Amino acid sequence: DNVKKDELILSSRDQIKGKVNFEIKTDSLLQPQIDILFQKMLPILHPEDIVTSFNWKSIQDFKELFSCRYGIILDHEDALFEAKSLSIHDEDMFFMVERTLLDSRNFDLPLNRTVIWTVNEKNDFVHFLDMGAFGVITDIPDTMHIYRK
């Protein structure tokens, strides 16, 4: 009753309709804490959701337990080689790729499993979708929504 009109309090995942991108940040956590975080998250996942993280190890460790899509986040060119190897060995893995990495001569990930962030130019937005990217994320959703096929 004390909730402001523009404030939403979630007590259940069922209150959220549609797809959710759970971007798990683990920078300040120790491995046992990371494991607990991932274990606690498992029961709230829906098949249409996606779990992503810069913590590739945890995504790999828990991928068999996810009831939804999963992926790794890349923001530097050095990560492209290892990500390419993962893309060959794990056909279910998605890749959340920082926009500038698409311009790298080393970019060779499957576009149908690649989500590009952050794209705020309409022409780039449309171009990436036309290229066959799985999705594009923007900081300006009022102008462009998060598109997914």
Model-predicted segments: where are they?
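Metal-dependent phosphodiesterase/phospholipase catalytic core, i.e.
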Residues: 1-77, 90-100
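C-terminal active-site rim and adjoining tail of enzyme catalytic domains
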Residues: 1-8, 12, 71-149
